[in-house]
């Protein structure tokens, strides 16, 4: 594969970095307002591009304000309701709470982006970039691993309901593993022992370095792409494909048996209600995992292009799109649960009646038993 040397794109790098070249009245280059001691933290790739219009930075800053408000309200509600409602404090839902926590914390760093955007660039400097990178890496990698464990849990609940039950101890162990799994990547970049956090695009956001043209950077990008994206995505795809296969084969077996017995269905009302709820929860989890895949794939592709492909494809404007998709999914996740998780909807309805959520309580075994007893008594009396 042919690698593009950044210096060949820049021509004479020193001329690009000259103050008079960067402060031209006609066209300012990115980084023109960055102190000289901070320029060394910025990949040279970005410094050849003109500064974007002020309106573009204002637009992105405003968009991120919207993302932050929606995500923090939505994920805050998920964490509150799932933690406060006794019926939702199940081992499986510990993973749901952790996913909401990751999405919530992902938006904690957006004030750095917003401040930089309204100040037209790398305003908070290297320190702000490090904070942005640390939080973003922890929450992004942890969200992917959490989605993988949610898929594993749904697989066990639906395909092995008796022996595959989650326990609180197992759920806590999974959470600990998730953050231990993310820690080496974060520490390596923060200490710059392998990789580093650098600004990207309009120099208003930061991520791991995928542009420096050397073996260490390419190896780091390949490894983090595999362990933080390919591995979770593979697990998610496998477990949900197994769920779909199990549901279809189970339904077919029930229909065949019912036909042999000349009955409409072999399920009791309780079984139907319980399975319907489980399927709805699985659908919600599948949707969220699809959103994870759709939102992080552009970022993964972009980093691979930066490390192994044609860097000229990565313009500042183009690289801001994957950054936005990652934040967008943090806004959508809680509303997927609001739509698809029946018990969450019920508890949210109790605590926030002004939301006008209409969710009926599932038919319980006790209610069905009482109804059956009454019918039997009426039949006997007759």
Swiss-Prot record:
Residues 82-93, 153-170, 248-283, 341-382 are cytoplasmic. One of its GO terms (molecular function) is G protein-coupled photoreceptor activity. This is Opsin Rh3. Phosphorylated on some or all of the serine and threonine residues present in the C-terminal region. The lineage of its organism: Eukaryota, Metazoa, Ecdysozoa, Arthropoda, Hexapoda. GO terms for biological process: phototransduction; visual perception. The modification N6-(retinylidene)lysine is found at residue 327. The keyword Cell inner membrane does not apply. Disulfide bonds join 129-206. Each Drosophila eye is composed of 800 facets or ommatidia. Each ommatidium contains 8 photoreceptor cells (R1-R8), the R1 to R6 cells are outer cells, while R7 and R8 are inner cells. Opsin Rh3 is sensitive to UV light.
């Amino acid at each position: 594969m042919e690698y593009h040397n950044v210096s060949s794109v820049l021509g004479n790098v020193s001329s690009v970095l000259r103050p008079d070249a960067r402060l031209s009245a006609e066209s300012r280059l990115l980084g023109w307002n960055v102190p000289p001691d901070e320029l060394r933290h910025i990949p040279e790739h970005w410094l050849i591009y003109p500064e974007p219009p002020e309106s573009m930075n204002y637009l992105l800053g405003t968009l991120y304000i919207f993302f932050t408000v929606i995500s923090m309200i939505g994920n805050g509600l998920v964490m509150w309701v799932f933690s406060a409602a006794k019926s939702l404090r199940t081992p499986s839902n510990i993973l749901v709470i952790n996913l909401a926590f990751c999405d919530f914390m992902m938006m904690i760093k957006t004030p750095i982006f917003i401040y930089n955007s309204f100040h037209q660039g790398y305003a908070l400097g290297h320190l702000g970039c490090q904070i942005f990178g640390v939080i973003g890496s922890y929450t992004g990698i942890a969200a992917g691993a959490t989605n993988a464990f949610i898929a594993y849990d749904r697989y066990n609940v639906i395909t092995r309901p008796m022996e595959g039950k989650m326990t609180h101890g197992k759920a806590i162990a999974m959470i600990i593993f998730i953050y231990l799994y993310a820690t080496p990547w974060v520490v390596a970049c923060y200490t710059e022992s392998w990789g580093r956090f650098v600004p990207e695009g309009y120099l208003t956001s930061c991520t791991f370095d995928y542009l420096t043209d050397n073996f260490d950077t390419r190896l780091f990008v390949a490894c983090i792409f595999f362990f933080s994206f390919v591995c979770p995505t593979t697990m998610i795809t496998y477990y949900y494909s197994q769920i779909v296969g199990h549901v279809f084969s189970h339904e077919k077996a029930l229909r065949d048996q019912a036909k042999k017995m000349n009955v409409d269905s072999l399920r009791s009302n309780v079984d139907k209600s319980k399975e319907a709820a489980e399927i709805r929860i699985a659908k919600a989890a599948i949707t969220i995992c699809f959103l994870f895949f759709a939102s992080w794939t552009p970022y993964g592709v972009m980093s691979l292009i930066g490390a192994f492909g044609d860097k000229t494809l990565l313009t500042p404007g183009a690289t801001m799109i994957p950054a936005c998709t990652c934040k967008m999914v943090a806004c959508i996740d809680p509303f997927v649960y609001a739509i698809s998780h029946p018990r969450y909807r019920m508890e949210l309805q109790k605590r926030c009646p002004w939301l006008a959520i209409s969710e009926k309580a599932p038919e319980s075994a006790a209610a069905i038993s009482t109804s059956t007893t009454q019918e039997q008594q009426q039949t006997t009396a007759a």
